Amino acid sequence: SDVYKRQVHKKGSVLVNRSYTQTVGDKEIRVSIPEEYYTEIYNYLNHIGKGKMSSEAQRYLDEGKIKSFTATKDIVKNYRYCCDHYFLHLPITINFKAKSDVAVNERTLAYIAKKEDIHIIGIDRGERNLLYISVVDVHGNIREQRSFNIVNGYDYQQKLKDREKSRDAARKNWEEIEKIKELKEGYLSMVIHYIAQLVVKYNAVVAMEDLNYGFKTGRFKVERQVYQKFETMLIEKLHYLVFKDREVCEEGGVLRGYQLTYIPESLKKVGKQCGFIFYVPAGYTSKIDPTTGFVNLFSFKNLTNRESRQDFVGKFDEIRYDRDKKMFEFSFDYNNYIKKGTILASTKWKVYTNGTRLKRIVVNGKYTSQSMEVELTDAMEKMLQRAGIEYHDGKDLKGQIVEKGIEAEIIDIFRLTVQMRNSRSESEDREYDRLISPVLNDKGEFFDTATADKTLPQDADANGAYCIALKGLYEVKQIKENWKENEQFPRNKLVQDNKTWFDFMQKKRYL
């Protein structure tokens, strides 16, 4: 048949596994064997080519990660496509008489306004995670959070990384491009299925990053194109959500599916809502203290001369040593500094030299991928001791700092103090992604993902998903407060600027 190009493992050929099981923490995951080493091993065992392997490929054999068997008959991949068949296809159009997509949005608003037990699923692309979700209730409590680097035991982050190492070569190899495309779509399909289950389990709406509102770029593991594909697939999944394990006429069965979205003409025309999906601006989500709402808005780029540095230090209310906490305290009012045009709900803050921070190592005037750990209080003490400044009495140190001319060193310590996200490069430690706050919260604690329990975000990417969920919660609360039967809902109530977000977060309006 010409229907499908046969890919056959001939009888007598040796088949080799493409992945192996590895224990990580308390989980077993499937780790892919890089394509180049798999090909070497396959050719070697089937006596194809030179009969030699690289040391890297040999290591997989020596460590027992390779399982092989000899085919006792011809094995044809996707055999069902190799034969001619007739298929009787009878399409059914659900909601054939529906006149408008608008009803989906309006009925969603009514559902949210009337439903007591509702949750919000925040979805975020991460710097260290392909996708991260956080499920919160109407009081902002985390009910569930997880990364989607590993799905069904497979480390897809590593798998995609391995596949795309040969991206340049892949551009010339359409078969390899097709494999990467299929891998991404297969991954997204599994993630979307999981999210769809959560929507039904928690009576949840979905909050996700608005692609048309300052879409974040930079060091993210899911690029814009793939994220748009994810968004499209999620809309299509929730447009008519059915579960195969339910009876045909049961709620959620094939004839009584959940219609939770509508299919838009294009993503750009969706606006801020597509049924159960709400789009929120993602600004100030991952690098914000989830317990106090503190965020670093300082700009250090223009502190290029002593005059500007003296002015910066002089604007602090106090710089002093706190003997009880055994840390240094910087107190300030954000109104005295440039705030990137942002209006805060709380402007007066006290930050402390709490814990350690990562500082990237500079070689020949350029930043490297390596970092060093700086113990803030210890570094501050040594700096003041070298300058001959006494600090144990707890008095304000600003005058002596300027007098001794160490403003640059103090500002460097302060910059690290308000640097909340601290991530090592992948070459150092791919798992190290710590968020640590310099501000005491209501419990008298400094938020730190290294010590936070499961009721709080577990890393910086988790914090991004959590805060996106909280932005979704803001909209849920606005709907509950302003929706009225048989009246047009005022859509302007769902607009969120930075001022609104900081007020909601810093004043804990969600409690």
Sequence positions of predicted segments:
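Hydrophobic, well-ordered secondary-structure segments
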Residues: V24, P34-Y38, W501-K508
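Nucleotide/phosphate-binding catalytic cleft detector across ATP-hydrolyzing
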Residues: Q7, T21, N78, N95
